[in-house]
Amino acid sequence: MPLMAKAAAMSGAVGIRANTVRDITQIKEVVDLPVIGIIKKDYPGTPMYITVTMKEVDELVACGVDILAVQGTGALRPDGSTSAEFIRAIKAKYPDQLVMADCDNFENAMACAEAGADFVGTTMRGYTPETQGIDDIDFDFVHKLATECPAKVIAEGHIHYPEQAV
């Protein structure tokens, strides 16, 4: 992954999104770009898999991730907490840590932003039961978030061609 990050930086990337403490640590050693960090892990009984527990948050903060991303959908975490409750707990423990919520719909994005997420991403749109079947970038969704959500918006997922990113 460090070589991929170097290639991305040389091509003009302004940030890197990476999974696992190992990859994040190695990437931060070779590029001077902000890193959005996640830890993907499956948990029985929940569809949540992107930075699901405080243990993963602690690991990401310890490795110096610039922005910590968590799943911000309507499913409950293994401990029964909502995405908004989890974000509030992260901000209480790490008030200076930037947090991104990987969301699927407007309601979840707003709840995460109101709970303290600094960024909301469209990452999970099309990947939850509520949004299943959305296979292309949803510009109306991105526009609604950009105009109504208090957090900064990162359009992510289902962007297949450079023309879609403009």
Language-model features and meaning:
Residues 32-81:
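Glycine/small-residue-rich loop that forms an oxyanion/phosphate-binding "nest" at active or ligand-binding sites
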Residues 31-45, 86, 91-104, 146-157:
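Short beta-strand/loop segments at the ligand-binding rim of alpha/beta enzyme cores
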